[in-house]
């Protein structure tokens, strides 16, 4: 006869499929929160600038991870302060083949010339402060994995509402 074993490598399989399993079980987009802070726990320098508080290796890894998610989100404050492009770039600054949907969360108007509106990737502005409503909207659009980059207010709101699946 044939001997059957079940449950082998179950944890490993769950880990590999965690995004899909969580999104489908909860009918909600899986959320990964990228969090960088200075040694004193701040998300910006003392003078308010926030260009980069992480190192080059961390930025390279972040771009590689961006290329593997469905969408990347920041708040309007981050767009106004930093003018990010929110693309997934290789170390030589060329774009990865897959570019995540760029999602801007918040009610403030943004300048039409902001880099998030260039043609490198699609951009969606959700003019709301309701994170659950935003996640519903993204899930309905087929977004199963969201990478939240901040700023600090948006990141804190995700944590406070217990809507982060992975840090």
Each predicted region: which residue ranges?
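Active-site ligand-binding patch in enzyme domains
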Residues: 18-147, 152-156
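Short hydrophobic/aromatic-enriched beta-strand-loop microsegments
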Residues: 4-6, 95-97, 164-167
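Short acidic amphipathic segments
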Residues: 154, 158-166
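Zn2+-dependent cytidine deaminase-like catalytic core
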Residues: 1-14, 157-159
């Amino acid at each position: 006869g044939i001997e059957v074993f079940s449950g082998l490598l179950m944890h490993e399989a769950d880990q590999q499929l965690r995004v899909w399993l969580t999104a489908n079980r909860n009918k909600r987009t899986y959320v990964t929160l990228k969090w960088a802070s200075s040694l004193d726990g701040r998300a910006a320098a003392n003078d308010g600038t926030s260009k980069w508080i992480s190192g080059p290796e961390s930025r390279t890894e972040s771009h590689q991870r961006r290329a593997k998610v469905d969408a990347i989100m920041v708040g309007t404050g981050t767009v106004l302060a930093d003018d990010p492009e929110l693309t997934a770039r290789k170390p030589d600054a060329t774009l990865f083949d897959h570019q995540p949907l760029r999602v801007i969360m918040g009610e403030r108007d943004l300048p039409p010339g902001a880099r998030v509106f260039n043609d490198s990737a699609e951009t969606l502005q959700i003019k709301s402060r309701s994170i659950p409503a935003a996640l519903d909207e993204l899930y309905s659009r087929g977004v199963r994995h969201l990478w939240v980059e901040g700023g600090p207010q948006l990141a804190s709101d995700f944590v406070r509402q217990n809507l982060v699946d992975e840090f």
